[in-house]
């Protein structure tokens, strides 16, 4: 099952040229770029591992692409995403996030439902590889 999280998630995977163009757009807006990775694609897993520190002072996308390539070499079977962070006063938030690397075989999610006291229902997601 293809994981659909972030911008461009319903499109085919971006090429490195397309990723570079998106990174350059973000840098042109003055946004910092961060690289993150995980092996757990669960929708509630919002805390991915950071690859180094966010890059606040870059002007050229080449620096981000070099870090992305290093992360891909170290974690070829993990999900890798780029986050653009707007540090403007009052915003201070992630403004763009998109997946740039996926494992060859993506896991699927299965939902199980159980009844509890008072007919309340509990849901659980399981990752199946």
UniProtKB/Swiss-Prot annotation:
Q: Which domain of life is it from?
A: Bacteria
Asked whether the UniProt record includes Phosphoprotein among its keywords, one would answer no
Note down the stretches annotated as region Disordered. 109-129
Q: Which UniProt keywords apply?
A: Calvin cycle, Carbon dioxide fixation, Plasmid
**According to its UniProt record, what is one Pfam family this protein matches?**
RuBisCO_small
One molecular function GO term is: ribulose-bisphosphate carboxylase activity
Q: Which SUPFAM superfamilies match?
A: RuBisCO, small subunit
Record's keyword annotation contains Magnesium: no
Against Gene3D superfamilies, the record matches this protein to: Ribulose bisphosphate carboxylase, small subunit (3.30.190.10)
The entry's function note states:
RuBisCO catalyzes two reactions: the carboxylation of D-ribulose 1,5-bisphosphate, the primary event in carbon dioxide fixation, as well as the oxidative fragmentation of the pentose substrate. Both reactions occur simultaneously and in competition at the same active site. Although the small subunit is not catalytic it is essential for maximal activity.
Quaternary structure (record): Heterohexadecamer of 8 large and 8 small subunits.
What is the official name of this protein in its record?
Ribulose bisphosphate carboxylase small subunit
User: Which source organism?
Assistant: Rhizobium meliloti (strain 1021) (Ensifer meliloti)
């Amino acid at each position: 099952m293809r994981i659909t999280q972030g911008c461009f998630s319903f499109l085919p995977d971006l090429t490195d040229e397309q990723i570079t163009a998106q990174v350059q757009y973000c840098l042109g807006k003055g946004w910092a770029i961060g690289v993150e990775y995980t092996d757990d694609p669960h929708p509630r897993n919002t805390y991915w591992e950071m690859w180094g520190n966010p890059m606040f002072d870059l002007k050229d996308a080449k620096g981000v692409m070099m870090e992305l390539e290093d992360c891909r070499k170290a974690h070829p079977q993990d999900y890798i995403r780029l986050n653009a962070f707007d540090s403007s006063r009052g915003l201070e938030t992630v403004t763009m996030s998109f997946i740039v690397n996926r494992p060859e075989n993506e896991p699927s999610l299965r939902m199980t439902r159980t009844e509890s006291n008072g007919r309340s229902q509990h849901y659980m997601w399981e990752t199946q590889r």
